[in-house]
Regions:
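Extended rod-forming repeat segments used as scaffolds/tethers
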Residues: 16, 28, 51-53
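A short, exposed loop/beta-hairpin motif centered on an aromatic-Gly-Thr core
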Residues: 23-32
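Short aromatic-glycine-(Arg/Gly/Cys) micro-motifs in beta-strand/loop hairpins
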Residues: 7-22
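Hydrophobic residues in alpha-helical membrane-spanning segments
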Residues: 21-24, 59-61
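Short, charged, surface-exposed hinge/linker loops at domain edges
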Residues: 1-5, 37-71
Length: 71
């Protein structure tokens, strides 16, 4: 089992997400929770495709941090 970092962004009317370790693996949803669920499904599908093509499955390496700056 792998634990991938995803980035979720607020869009106009919904949310979008991507996984930095899996280029092209994206999802959208009406809520944060819905987007997370769809992203999980997208990652699983993406990895299945890599396996089918006998390609290497990238190890999770992306890290996310929040920083505070003066505004």
């Amino acid at each position: 089992m792998h634990k991938y970092t995803i980035v979720i962004e607020k869009a106009e009317g919904n949310y979008s997400a991507y996984c930095p370790d899996l280029p092209g693996c994206i999802a959208t949803g009406p809520t944060v929770e819905g987007t997370i669920q769809r992203m999980k499904e997208a990652i699983e599908f993406h990895i299945q495709g890599l396996k089918k093509e006998r390609l290497a499955i990238p190890e999770p390496s992306a890290k996310a941090v929040s920083i505070e700056v003066a505004a």
